[in-house]
Amino acid sequence: MKFVINTSIACWLLAWPCFAQSPESDTLRIQQLRTVEVRTSRPGEVHSLPDQQGTYLMAGRRTELIRLADTDADVAQKNPRQLLARVPGVFIYDMDGSGNQINVATRGLDAHRSWEMNMRYNGVLTNSDMYGYPASHFSPPGESLERIEMVRGTASLQYGAQFGGMLNMVSKQADTTRRFSFESIASIGSYGLRSTYNAVGGRVGKLTYYGYAYWRHADGYRQNSQSDAQALFASLRYQASSRLSISAELARSTYVYHIPGPLTDSMFRADPRQATRTRNYFSPDIWVPSVRADWQLSNQTRLQLITSAVLGVRNSVLIDAFATVPDVPDAVTGQYRQRQVDSDHFNSFTTEARLLHQFQLAGMATTAVVGGQLMHNDLHRQQLGKGTTGSDYDMTLTAPFGRDLWYYTRNGAFFAEMQLKVTPRLTLSPGIRFEHGLTRMRGVITNYDPGNLPNDIRHQFVLLGISGQYRVNEALRLYGGISQAYRPVIFKDIIPASTYEQVDKNLRDANGYNAELGVEGRWKGVHVNMSLFDVLYRNRMGTLVQTGTDGQPYTFRTTIGDSRSQGVEVLLEGQVLNAGRLTVSGFTSTAFMDARYINANVSAGTENRNVTGNQVESAPRFTSRNGLTFRYRTASLTAQYSYVGMTYSDALNTPVVTANGAKGPVPAYGVWDLNATWRVTPWLHVRGSVNNLLNSQYFTKRPLFYPGPGVWSSDGRNAVLSVGIKL
């Protein structure tokens, strides 16, 4: 990275006393000094968040801070295995085509739209509906990101109760030294990729502004997998005084993805790029407005208030069937079948208040954070509508929705955490969170007895946690902690899949804990962060076979048991060679995990089967990402190899692939990537990537629901070139 420092003024001020004391001349000769250019670079290391990050307390936890400018990652396609390469154990699910949404999870959790995580953008919650559909459909462009912050679940009492922790994507900010600045990044790539990102920002008096507009098109690796994306962002911050700032932000992301459909294993082996659908589409359109106040009440006290919303819609129109069911015109009429139309309407409002205060307690330096969170969510779900027989993205109905439901949630939470400096080296952080809320489901399902629908679900938890940290010295720390967590019963859990399915009226929210114990240190340019973890997840949802009063079997949706994930996460990175202008650094980010069901039973045909000891689906035992980075002056080149072990698609651990591809093992895979960056001048940079260099054919998951059971091919070899300017 280059830093350009104009030293003219500094040299003039230093020289002034000498001129002033000269008796030989009362005139000054003015000489224009040359600009001095200082060039340096920061290694692409992952850093832990500081013990206090704004109004968050982070001591004693495993955290990661990734600055995108320090990496060579493919930002244009927001490639998560590169962006999060140095976060060990991250499971990545390829679903919506490159460049759209990031689907990630850690420690044996489900990666579907990152819904086990507390997802944020600039600290603002972006999960679509935390109690109805916690998936994050909001998808900011990679070009807009300055850094990514990840916090594991042991800190969840402060921001939510999610098992997966928090992932906060932080946007670039305005250059406050200028009234106006401009940035533009244009990208082209394989399979019709074209994108442009344009941003402006600056400061005028007490007002700081920043905004961007983004557009991207890609034809996609597979047939019928085009996507078109747009994003907008605007931010205004008013510095009312040296202690008070008020800001407002408005973010929007939307895209339309042409869904190519699932494959069977034989189809995948024959041609992983083929499609089984030509008329399936998915499109979220999400707005995230927010208002924030940061008030430094005193040198010891800080107050932060954020009011935000997630507003928008998630639409899909598709033929929902196995890969073995072709979507072809009727032999008699020549018409296609009518497509299924589904639509979720999100109206999620959140207010969060956080008060941080520093004081002495029994002679110990103490930092305390107390706060509250209020959620007011209305989710309107419309499903099983009959659409057109056409082939375009068209949400027109020809018959009413088969499901027309509302999911109302009112929830309040209070939390408190203290960071106690027991000794100059030892820190303890106990915390508590209290959740109290009610979710009400109303509406109709065609041909289903309303009396069989659960109506009200209460959420009431007291969650406890404690973390500790011991700094052996400035370069070495020991950390660990345990925190309780829970996941509310969501809309999907309580809606019967068919008239032959019933839902437990006494469903219980999932609950459990996150525990970790680790060591982090730096020694002679080597950075090591190694942690052990243990995640207990009670009340997992599933189905059992029951017998009705008429003697007929039926499917019963309920909690089917628990699971436990244990393992080790290791990050090792450091400089391998320093030969003046040429440096070579490397890293390995590796995790071993054993995630298994305990005390669990699931339905298998017409019987229930005990799955205690079976592996949790989509939880690889071994994940490793490794890379070497070569830096010469202002250019860098990174070669990365990613390996993900074999996983199962279902709790039964079905050993043999089914004919329709819906169940069976997901084979292990390895992928090579090559990325480069050249910072030509302080205002011009070029990035290039060759993803999946050896053209490996692989897939990451066999989904059991959306976008359809079966094999979903990940992208083969592809390249992208980006050029960026800053003025």
Question: Where are the regions that the model predicts?
Answer:
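Gram-negative outer-membrane beta-barrel transporters
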Residues: 424, 532-536, 554-653, 694
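Face-selective signature of the C-terminal outer-membrane beta-barrel domain
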Residues: 242-246, 251, 285-319, 331-444, ...
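Structural signature of Gram-negative outer-membrane beta-barrels, strongest in the C-terminal barrel
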Residues: 241, 346, 363-367, 373-375, ...
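Membrane-embedded beta-barrel scaffold of Gram-negative outer-membrane proteins
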Residues: 294-320, 471, 477-483, 508-573, ...
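C-terminal beta-signal and adjacent terminal beta-strands/loops
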Residues: 486, 538, 584, 642-653, ...
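Transmembrane beta-barrel wall of Gram-negative outer-membrane proteins
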Residues: 188-217, 222-258, 280-301, 433
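Short acidic/polar hinge/loop motifs at secondary-structure boundaries
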Residues: 124-152
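Extracytoplasmic beta-strand/coil segments of soluble accessory domains associated
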Residues: 53-57, 65-66, 75, 81-128
